[in-house]
Amino acid sequence: MQYLEIKGGKKLSGSVTISGAKNAALPVIAATILSDKDVTLTNLPNVVDIRTLLKLLTMLGGVVEHEGTVAKINNGSITSTKAVYEIVSQMRASILVLGPLLTRFGECEVSLPGGCAIGQRPIDLHLKALEAMGAKITIESGYVHAVAPNGLHGAKIIFDKITVGGTENIIMAAALAKGTTIIINAAKEPEIVQLCEMIADAGVKIEGIGTNELTIEGTDGIPLAFKTVEIIPDRIEAGTYLCAGAITKSEITLNKVNAEHIRASIDKLESMGFTFDIAKDSITIHPTDIINPVNLITIEYPGFPTDMQAQFMAVAAMADGESLIEERLFENRFMHVSELNRLGADIWLKGSVAAVKGVKELHGADVMATDLRASSALVLAGLVAEGTTNVRRIYHLDRGYDNLEGKLAALGADIVRKEEEK
């Protein structure tokens, strides 16, 4: 088992290039199922979840050539429509093959998903919407069995709550359906905008891209021919590196980043005293002598992202005063609190609110990652903790961060990946 050893107290400097967005790449990869021709994807991040989904495509019969940040995919040879437990249990996003498989082939079986253990993230909204489009769905032995013998048809889908994965699944299902699908209360993250633009560039008429209401005219079963897709920059990775600069009171520059996608994080960091130089595709954060406390509430895009909550908690732990952080999207996303407290943070929980009382210093300790973003918060805390911090169970990090320790080391951090002694 691998872990990260961090010796804290080093200032950071220099620049870091932001990788492609995992959460954009996953639905884009799933959407290639809508085509029976070659599709080229560029700027893919080197993370485990991407390799897992590409492996799933090959298990379905697709042909994948993947080298570095580029993948060439041809799903014209798919022979199976069953996404097996062995793959889906590793990564929740595997459920994204449900919509495209069903709309193209009229049937599929997908194992119920796995991934980060951050509360209940049921897929009932996905299934209810697909049923409205004509699917017959049963759940047996841990698998979703879906059939649409006459193909899917357009429908008016009103999501009871905003769901990113549900929106993505229905966009893909609607692309090859017969007739017009209207999605009300759709998610509008940049990753969803990229998926819509990819499908629209292939000839599908989509109105309302970037809004909460989408109208999609399907092709009635005709597969799509996609152009080359360049994955957008990872806004969560970008936010994480801004927090690395913030917590270490360092000046660093992020390259290949879209500032508009991380506006909520920038605004909160500005309220904490940090200043920024923002160019077309780069951002430089400038340090502050005193970190102000912050109050924030996680909410759907364009609000403050739940995927940045843990990282901001690490920064708030070093603030001059008390911060309040409310988690409204997931009920079990404070598992990093006890680990941050092991490093000397002073954090109290009451329901969905964390009260973070800033401390003068943190101290190195052994800590354990519990999910993807929580693990990055522990790394951030380790950057400023006195002594040595060992972050264990970093397979969570590898699911979503492209070479985190390498990029931090290039900025000046004392961080190395090590193997546990047997």
Swiss-Prot record:
Keyword rRNA processing appears in the UniProt entry: no
Leading EC class: transferase
PANTHER family: UDP-N-ACETYLGLUCOSAMINE 1-CARBOXYVINYLTRANSFERASE
Catalytic reaction list: phosphoenolpyruvate + UDP-N-acetyl-alpha-D-glucosamine = UDP-N-acetyl-3-O-(1-carboxyvinyl)-alpha-D-glucosamine + phosphate
Keywords: Cell cycle, Cell division, Cell shape, Cell wall biogenesis/degradation, Cytoplasm, Peptidoglycan synthesis, Pyruvate, Transferase
Domain of life: Bacteria
Organism listed in the record: Sulfurovum sp. (strain NBC37-1)
InterPro entries given in the database record: Enolpyruvate_Tfrase_dom (IPR001986), Enolpyruvate_Tfrase_sf (IPR036968), MurA_subfamily (IPR050068), RNA3'P_cycl/enolpyr_Trfase_a/b (IPR013792), UDP_GlcNAc_COvinyl_MurA (IPR005750)
A Gene Ontology biological process term: cell division
Pathway: Cell wall biogenesis; peptidoglycan biosynthesis
Record-stated family: Belongs to the EPSP synthase family. MurA subfamily.
Pfam families the UniProt entry points to: EPSP_synthase
Record-listed 2-(S-cysteinyl)pyruvic acid O-phosphothioketal modification sites: C116
Binding annotation for phosphoenolpyruvate: K22, N23
Cell compartments where the protein resides: Cytoplasm
EC code(s) of this entry: 2.5.1.7
One GO MF term: UDP-N-acetylglucosamine 1-carboxyvinyltransferase activity
Function as written in the Swiss-Prot or TrEMBL entry: Cell wall formation. Adds enolpyruvyl to UDP-N-acetylglucosamine.
Residues the entry annotates as binding UDP-N-acetyl-alpha-D-glucosamine: R92, R121, P122, I123, D124, L125, D307, L329
Lineage: Bacteria, Pseudomonadati, Campylobacterota, Epsilonproteobacteria, Campylobacterales
Active site feature: C116
GO cellular component, one term: cytoplasm
Protein name listed in UniProt: UDP-N-acetylglucosamine 1-carboxyvinyltransferase
